């Protein structure tokens, strides 16, 4: 926790100073800082670290034919591996490739740190007027802990961020290809596909009012309908067991 606080403090100190001279230099420095923070953490750091590490060792023990045979042709389903290690196809392939190249689990962490830090910095530099402040906000709103804790979701998010340019340029096919690639690491990113049609919707006060009313109604009904809705949604991803139970106190 102290490391995360120091990281945010350093960005706040040198960010505005360096950015006033060169935004690219500033983002590069912050990117290196984020990379080191994510890459040099202990393998055991994070709530799911043991499962990911054990999964890496298990996948690394597979032969090429075994790994290939375990892949599921259905992108919305997991690879056909034993429970706890039956990750998405892309995650299985990535783990196997890095292990085959001689990298340990720490090598996977370093690879993910590089992709994550570069993706966040690329996104901030391209779409933010003050990229250092965007990265500062990212560092203070639990995104780094998110990046450390849930590796597959973070990789899927990082890939998705590269696809935003296709929303801006109005290239739906390329955008969906990026979404499909990201889904190979975590299927929940399919929800991000909604951003393309939403980005073309002009917001008015009336629409915002309707959205607010719908949100209030949804919150009021959530205790009654959310458990069943969650079961249906999570069922699509093979995660029915994660459905929560809601009740009024």
Give the positions of each predicted feature.
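Transmembrane alpha-helices of multi-pass, membrane-embedded glycan-processing enzymes
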Residues: 95-99, 108-119
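Membrane-interface transmembrane helices that cradle and orient dolichyl/undecaprenyl
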Residues: 128, 160-173
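Transmembrane-embedded, aromatic-rich helix segments that form part
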Residues: 5, 175-178, 188-199
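Transmembrane-helix signature of polytopic, membrane-embedded enzymes
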Residues: 21-29, 121-141
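Short hydrophobic/aromatic helix or loop-helix immediately within or flanking a transmembrane segment
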Residues: 50, 54-58, 68-103
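Start-transfer (signal-anchor) and selected internal transmembrane alpha helices
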Residues: 1-34
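Alpha-helical transmembrane segments and terminal signal-anchor/GPI-anchor hydrophobic tails
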Residues: 50-53, 60, 196-249
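Membrane-embedded helix bundles of polyisoprenyl
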Residues: 111-114, 132-161, 185-188
């Amino acid at each position: 926790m102290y490391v995360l606080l120091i990281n945010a403090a350093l960005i706040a100190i040198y960010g505005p100073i360096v950015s006033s001279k060169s935004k690219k230099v500033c983002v590069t420095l912050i990117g290196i800082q984020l990379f080191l923070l994510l890459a040099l953490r202990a393998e055991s750091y994070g709530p799911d670290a043991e499962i990911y590490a054990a999964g890496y060792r298990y996948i690394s023990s597979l032969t090429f034919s075994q790994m290939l045979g375990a892949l599921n042709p259905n992108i919305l389903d997991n690879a056909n591996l034993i429970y706890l290690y039956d990750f998405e196809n892309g995650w299985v392939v990535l783990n196997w490739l890095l292990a085959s190249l001689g990298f340990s689990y720490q090598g996977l962490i370093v690879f993910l740190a590089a992709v994550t830090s570069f993706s966040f910095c690329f996104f901030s530099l391209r779409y933010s007027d003050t990229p250092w402040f965007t990265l500062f906000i990212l560092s203070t709103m639990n995104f780094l802990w998110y990046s450390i804790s849930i590796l597959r979701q973070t990789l899927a998010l990082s890939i998705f961020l590269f696809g935003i340019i296709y929303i801006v340029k109005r290239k739906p096919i390329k955008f969906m290809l990026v979404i499909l690639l990201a889904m190979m690491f975590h299927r929940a990113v399919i929800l991000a596909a909604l951003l393309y049609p939403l980005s073309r919707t002009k917001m008015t006060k009336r629409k915002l009012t309707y959205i607010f009313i719908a949100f209030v109604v949804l919150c009021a009904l959530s205790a009654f309908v959310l458990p069943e809705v969650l079961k249906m949604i999570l069922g699509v991803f093979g995660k029915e067991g994660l459905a929560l139970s809601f009740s009024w106190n």
